[in-house]
């Protein structure tokens, strides 16, 4: 009996797209189609990855292409296409340029892969996932933005390093938009099951240091851009996308913070915003509504309003 492998299409063959292609093949999550509008780049990266298969120990197929038709009947699609942030540039500066790219991508998903589960990575994330949703006509449960998983990973890493403990013992997540107004929920963070607030009371870390970590988390992407001088983060964004993809393909039902479509949850309607969701074989299977205190609610509302303004300024 022949086992039909999943088909995973990656739209954009830049740094994140290339890293994603390598990770998908190494994990043998499915056959890969690496798409980019620039001739030669997806073909070259796909060939490079394919040539590593004898020593990498994977047997899935990977092709590079400039034809949208090759993404036909994909099981899952991850979108990283668009221009990347440069030093001094905010995610919002990317808005109009990348919105046009997302419109084209969305229209082709609608044409060739209307049943795929789609993960959007392109910035400014919360607005871009709205554009893809609009032009792809995908059901709201089958499209999601990758942001909260990455922001939460940064938050967890910074806490672990400061406490000098394993990152695996740190549980924390971030709500809201993927930008300066994101809301790392300190009250919900825990260390090996012990609330972070108690860890502060024990004197293992100060509130001031936690506040610094929150600020660093908000500026996590900018910090890497400033260090690289050219380009932006790609290993952590790619890893975060794979985490979400695996939960869908393997029906793991992981609870992950993602930019998802809200239709009344959290008092928000018709907007993609970062909240915890369950991802399984049916895509976004449930939105979890976390109760917030007054301060957290105020920050969340500010983040929601920032995303609303961003979406409103789209000229499509």
From Swiss-Prot:
EC top class, as a word: oxidoreductase
> Which Cys residues form disulphide pairs?
none
Q: Which GO terms describe its biological process?
A: lactate metabolic process; tricarboxylic acid cycle
Q: Which residues bind NAD(+)?
A: 12-17, 36, 98, 121-123
Cite a single GO MF annotation. Answer: L-malate dehydrogenase (NAD+) activity
Active-site residue numbers? 178
Q: What is its EC number?
A: 1.1.1.37
List the SUPFAM superfamilies.
LDH C-terminal domain-like (SSF56327), NAD(P)-binding Rossmann-fold domains (SSF51735)
Sorted alphabetically, which InterPro entries does this protein's record hold? L-lactate/malate_DH (IPR001557), Lactate/malate_DH_C (IPR022383), Lactate/malate_DH_N (IPR001236), Lactate_DH/Glyco_Ohase_4_C (IPR015955), Malate_DH_type3 (IPR011275), NAD(P)-bd_dom_sf (IPR036291)
Q: Where does substrate bind?
A: 85, 91, 123, 154
| The keyword Ligase belongs to this UniProt entry's keyword annotation | no
Q: Does the keyword Transport apply?
A: no
Which reaction(s) are listed as its catalytic activity?
(S)-malate + NAD(+) = oxaloacetate + NADH + H(+)
Q: Which key words are in the record?
A: NAD, Oxidoreductase, Tricarboxylic acid cycle
Write out the similarity annotation.
Belongs to the LDH/MDH superfamily. MDH type 3 family.
Report the function annotation for this chain. Answer: Catalyzes the reversible oxidation of malate to oxaloacetate.
Q: What is this protein called?
A: Malate dehydrogenase
Task: Provide the species name.
Answer: Wolbachia sp. subsp. Brugia malayi (strain TRS)
Q: Which gene encodes it?
A: mdh
